[in-house]
Curated annotation (Swiss-Prot):
Protein's UniProt name: Homoserine kinase
Gene name in the database record: thrB
Pfam annotation, one family: APH
Keyword tags: Amino-acid biosynthesis, ATP-binding, Kinase, Nucleotide-binding, Threonine biosynthesis, Transferase
GO annotation terms (biological process): threonine biosynthetic process
EC number: 2.7.1.39
CDD domains noted in UniProt: HomoserineK_II
Length: 316
C-alpha cells in the first residue's frame, strides 16, 4: 500500500475536530497513490479524502488550493480543499502538509471506450478554458529542463535499445526547450491518467490528484492525457478513442496551426516525461511496499510515437 505516513486513530480524530463534520466512523489508506499518502475518511457528515503531501515544495501548496477553488467555482468536478471553522485550508499532520477534501463519487475506468474519451476531452477543454484567461503561474518541477537532466543521468544505466530510443527524444526536447514556441497556455493538470478520473456510470464524475498541476502549454497536457486514455497495450494509439477525445476537446477550444505542427513531438515529449519519472521511482522504491508503475509502458508508447498518424482536428 502506498501510504508513506501511517496514522493513529486518535491523532486523526484530533486533526479532524476543527472541521465540525462529526465523529470519525472509519478511515483507511488508499493503495493507488504513488507519491502522496491518501486516506478515505468517513465522518458523521459525509465521506472525505485526506491527503498528506509527501513530495514537492510546501510553498507551492497555496497554488493547488487556489487552482482547485477556481475550477470548482467554474463547475468542474474537482476536490476543493475544505476549511476549518477558523478558515484554514492548509494544515499539518504528522509533520506533513495536509488537506481534507470531499470524496467524489464514481470509480476509475480501466478500459475506456470512445465515449469515455469524449468525456475526458471535454473535461480537459473545460479546465483549460477556465484558466487560460487568468493563469495561475507555477512552472512544472518535471518540465523540459528536468527531462534533459534526468535523461542524461539515467541513459548510461539503460539497455542499448532503450538508450537508442531515448537519445533522439532528448535531442528533440533540447530543441523544443531552446525554441520555446508560442503555443497557447493555461493551467494544466499534467497527470490526467485513468486513475485520476472518476466515472459514475457513463458520466464523468470527478477529476482528482492535482499535485502535478502547473502552468504551461495546453498541447502538452492534451498529449499526456491522450497517451494514457487512447493507447493500446502495445503502446499504439487507438484511432477511435483518440479522435473522440480530440474532437470533444476541440469543441471547447479550436487548435492553432502551430499546435498542429508541434503535435507529434509533444506526444513524444509526454512519453519521455513519464518514462523517466517511472524509471526513477522504480529505482528509489525497489523492494518497498509502494505502488510502482511500469516504466516499460511508456518506453513502448514512445517507440510507437515515432510515426504519428492521428492529427489534430480542425487545425487553423
Amino acid at each position: 500500500m502506498s501510504v508513506f505516513t501511517p496514522l493513529e486513530r486518535s491523532t486523526l480524530e484530533a486533526f479532524l475536530a476543527p472541521y465540525d463534520l462529526g465523529r470519525l466512523r472509519d478511515f483507511r489508506g488508499i493503495a493507488e497513490g504513488s507519491e502522496n499518502s491518501n486516506f478515505f475518511v468517513s465522518l458523521e457528515h459525509g465521506e472525505f479524502v485526506l491527503t498528506l503531501v509527501e513530495r514537492g515544495p510546501v510553498q507551492d501548496l497555496p497554488f493547488f488550493i487556489e487552482l482547485l477553488d477556481v475550477l470548482h467555482e467554474d463547475g468542474l468536478p474537482v476536490p476543493y480543499a475544505l476549511r476549518t471553522r477558523d478558515g484554514e485550508a492548509l494544515r499539518r499532520l504528522e509533520g506533513k502538509p495536509a488537506l481534507l477534501q470531499p470524496r467524489l463519487a464514481g470509480r476509475h475506468e480501466r478500459q475506456p471506450n470512445a465515449h469515455h474519451c469524449q468525456e475526458v476531452g471535454d473535461l480537459l477543454g473545460h479546465l483549460h478554458a477556465a484558466t487560460r484567461g487568468r493563469i495561475l503561474e507555477r512552472p512544472s518541477d518535471r518540465g523540459l529542463p528536468w527531462m534533459l537532466e534526468q535523461g542524461a543521468n539515467l541513459a548510461p544505466r539503460l539497455p542499448e535499445q532503450a538508450r537508442a530510443l531515448l537519445a533522439p527524444a532528448l535531442a528533440e526536447i533540447a530543441a523544443l526547450d531552446a525554441e520555446r514556441p508560442a503555443l497557447p497556455r493555461a493551467n494544466l493538470h499534467a497527470d490526467l491518467f485513468r486513475d485520476n478520473v472518476l466515472f459514475d456510470g457513463p458520466h464523468l464524475a470527478g477529476l482528482i490528484d492535482f499535485y502535478n498541476a502547473c502552468s504551461g502549454w495546453m498541447l502538452y497536457d492534451l498529449a499526456i492525457t491522450l497517451n494514457d486514455w487512447c493507447s493500446n497495450t502495445d503502446g499504439s494509439l487507438d484511432p477511435a478513442r483518440a479522435r473522440a477525445l480530440l474532437a470533444a476537446y476541440a469543441n471547447r477550444r479550436p487548435f492553432t496551426a502551430l499546435e498542429a505542427e508541434h503535435w507529434p513531438s509533444m506526444l513524444r515529449v509526454a512519453c519521455v516525461r513519464f518514462w523517466l519519472s517511472r524509471l526513477i521511482a522504480a529505482e528509489a522504491f525497489a523492494g518497498q511496499d509502494v505502488l510502482i508503475h511500469d516504466p516499460a509502458e511508456f518506453e513502448m508508447r514512445l517507440a510507437q510515437r515515432q510515426n504519428v498518424e492521428i492529427h489534430l482536428p480542425f487545425a487553423l
